[in-house]
Amino acid sequence: MTIMRKKHPLIKIINHSFIDLPTPSNISSWWNFGSLLGLCLIIQILTGLFLAMHYTSDTSTAFSSVAHICRDVNYGWLIRYMHANGASMFFICLFLHVGRGIYYGSYNMIETWNMGIILLFAVMATAFMGYVLPWGQMSFWGATVITNLLSAIPYIGTTLVEWIWGGFSVDKATLTRFFAFHFILPFIITALVLVHLLFLHETGSNNPAGLNSDADKIPFHPYYTIKDFLGVLILLLAFMILTLFFPDILGDPDNYTPANPLNTPPHIKPEWYFLFAYAILRSIPNKLGGVLALILSIVILAFMPLLHTSKQRTLAFRPITQTMYWILVADLLILTWIGGQPVEYPFIIIGQTASIAYFAIIVIFMPIAGMIENNILDLD
């Protein structure tokens, strides 16, 4: 078996990636989220495949087909809720994974980091299109509002929106193409994940100390396979509690009303994992400015290697930047809360303040804190 593991052309790749992979001996549970994201992706592809067998992407039957899945298909309700809440678990793991990368300076592995940002965009696009498919009120109006933002692009905006819609409004053509893209994108994401891993294995993993760990590596299996398995059990426990006891807690009640173009819901909002970006979008009164701020809220991650001023890689030994980091986390939670609130006083001013703080912390305060720490520790 050992000979086959090390010699067989295909098994050799798996061996070098998951079995004999040299791994730093001190990586903590924050490094579990990569494997958990892989698990989430597998769950989403499998549940999505079974949903696609019964779903119809037609405006007249889409809502009914989802109801049919929940009522008449064997364990259809479970598959549907696993898929819906699986997306939430996916994003929880994603945000923690990115947060870990920022905290421990993993963004200095530039190719891996940039590939991760592309993956984040791809997953967000997939989730957005998936939210449109049940064809409830929030599906329809969410699709209308978010796609309509592209009309802010000068000259080509309106034409572009009508091209995406396949007509003059969100209708049958839009739903059909969104279903097609929602189906294909997870497989593209899987390919991008392999590229992400390829880049990661070129440099090796980072570690909590941020130091070179070449002198102290251990094989991935059995040490980290068993550690990852514990993370998998905890994730599945949380996932099953969410799916079986509170399946609708993260959803919107409006989506249980069939889509009606003549009746606008009182508060149009996306799923909870987009609320922080939605709050940033709404905090700018100008349409184009809001769209740019929305895109920049994610693209700014690509500039983190350039904004790294400290001589140390991680925040483990940098209390000033640590404080800035946790203020940023709190700020993102505030933005998430604001994104779900109506556009009125005092939520408007809180959202604008939190949006300014988000960009200021990343672009101004964290780099300055890094320079101050260099001075204090005399690392110049």
From Swiss-Prot:
GO molecular function: metal ion binding; ubiquinol-cytochrome-c reductase activity
Membrane-spanning segments: 33-53, 77-98, 113-133, 178-198, 226-246, 288-308, 320-340, 347-367
Protein's name in the database: Cytochrome b
Cellular-component GO terms for this entry: mitochondrial inner membrane; respiratory chain complex III
Binding site residues for heme b b562: 83, 182
Keyword check for NAD: no
Cysteine-cysteine disulfides: none
Organism this protein belongs to: Microtus quasiater (Jalapan pine vole)
Record text on subunit structure and interactions: The cytochrome bc1 complex contains 11 subunits: 3 respiratory subunits (MT-CYB, CYC1 and UQCRFS1), 2 core proteins (UQCRC1 and UQCRC2) and 6 low-molecular weight proteins (UQCRH/QCR6, UQCRB/QCR7, UQCRQ/QCR8, UQCR10/QCR9, UQCR11/QCR10 and a cleavage product of UQCRFS1). This cytochrome bc1 complex then forms a dimer.
Family: Belongs to the cytochrome b family.
InterPro entries in UniProt: Cyt_b/b6_C, Cyt_b/b6_C_sf, Cyt_b/b6_N, Cytb/b6-like_sf, Cytochrome_b, Cytochrome_b_C_euk/bac, Cytochrome_b_N_euk/bac, Di-haem_cyt_TM
Reported function: Component of the ubiquinol-cytochrome c reductase complex (complex III or cytochrome b-c1 complex) that is part of the mitochondrial respiratory chain. The b-c1 complex mediates electron transfer from ubiquinol to cytochrome c. Contributes to the generation of a proton gradient across the mitochondrial membrane that is then used for ATP synthesis.
An annotated GO BP: mitochondrial electron transport, ubiquinol to cytochrome c
Localization terms from the record: Mitochondrion inner membrane
Cofactor binding description: Binds 2 heme b groups non-covalently.
Residues that bind heme b b566: 97, 196
Additional detail: Heme 1 (or BL or b562) is low-potential and absorbs at about 562 nm, and heme 2 (or BH or b566) is high-potential and absorbs at about 566 nm.
Bilayer topology annotation: Multi-pass membrane protein
Record keywords, A-Z: Electron transport, Heme, Iron, Membrane, Metal-binding, Mitochondrion, Mitochondrion inner membrane, Respiratory chain, Transmembrane, Transmembrane helix, Transport, Ubiquinone
